[in-house]
């Protein structure tokens, strides 16, 4: 643009040169008359000046004197540069808003890929509430919410997938499902596998939005994923992150009797997100949100493992023999827990200052269900169970064994930060 303006300036000056030449020749006779009336000395001086001007004119290919060019430059250059600057500013003011708007709109469409994923699959995510039928709200008279979680629709006729720990092990309760459009339905539990921590629910409604199931075997570390659910009863909540590992063995997490390689992600999976989908950028579920250890470390059950569970559940339904599988229902305490393996302990110690360096084993209390025996006994999320009835607790299986002992009360030693405490819990019979 600047070169184009300079070329225009050059053409402008050349066109004005003719006018300058004409003005100079028009003024020449008067100059000669003046010289003829002067003294001889003046005549000689004028003749010398005329000879000098003629020499200058011969040296200048355009036929202008040095004085004439200097006059032209002295007049036209400031004027033309001002015009050039005005033209450039005007063109810039005209073009800049258009370029900025086009660029920003393009960025919004190009980089808001998370919003596109959510728009395509959020309608299939549901909120699950577990209502305690023995306790009622003082004002509404309705059963209070004992716990909550998430799930997602996998069949149009009302089949919903979630975690087993969301819907079982709480006696005297009922399950309620709220859809993304606000409609609420009672639900029945169809299949439960506590070994894999998976369950299916059924609500009596048709033509629901269905979540597409992808392939977790094709995932790579570093891929973007989106976790959907209802943390803390906040429906339709979205968090995003990347896959940190595609092969986190259950043994590394201290989960015995589970032959699962979990998906590890830094997408936030908090209370209430359990059972919700972990989806890829194609809007396909590639995992089921399961648990969180600490900020930036969460785990999901791979969808390929989930498909095996769903195939077996479908076969049982066809035979009319759908039933609960896995561990038998034990006495109820009301917690979700995670074994503290050496790797998890290292991560926790590096992220917090409130953990003793001497701690080498235990079970982390990840979630406490409100109104449960654990809640009534004083357990809190973040507590670390180290002993039950004077026996060391090294993994979650030791806690299940303590529940199966049949003792009426459990004397539990916990670490809350750096402080050691004791709590007493009376589990409920199934």
Curated annotation (Swiss-Prot):
Subunit structure as annotated in this protein's UniProt entry: Interacts with th/DIAP1 (via BIR 2 domain).
Name assigned to this protein: Serine protease HTRA2, mitochondrial
Compartment(s) where it occurs, according to its Swiss-Prot or TrEMBL record: Mitochondrion intermembrane space; Mitochondrion membrane
Chain positions covered by the region annotation Disordered: 30-61
Chief subcellular location: mitochondrion
EC assignment: 3.4.21.108
Catalytic activity: Cleavage of non-polar aliphatic amino-acids at the P1 position, with a preference for Val, Ile and Met. At the P2 and P3 positions, Arg is selected most strongly with a secondary preference for other hydrophilic residues
Organism of derivation: Drosophila mojavensis
Compositionally biased region (Low complexity): 30-51
TM spans (from-to): 72-90
PANTHER family: SERINE PROTEASE FAMILY S1C HTRA-RELATED, SERINE PROTEASE HTRA2, MITOCHONDRIAL
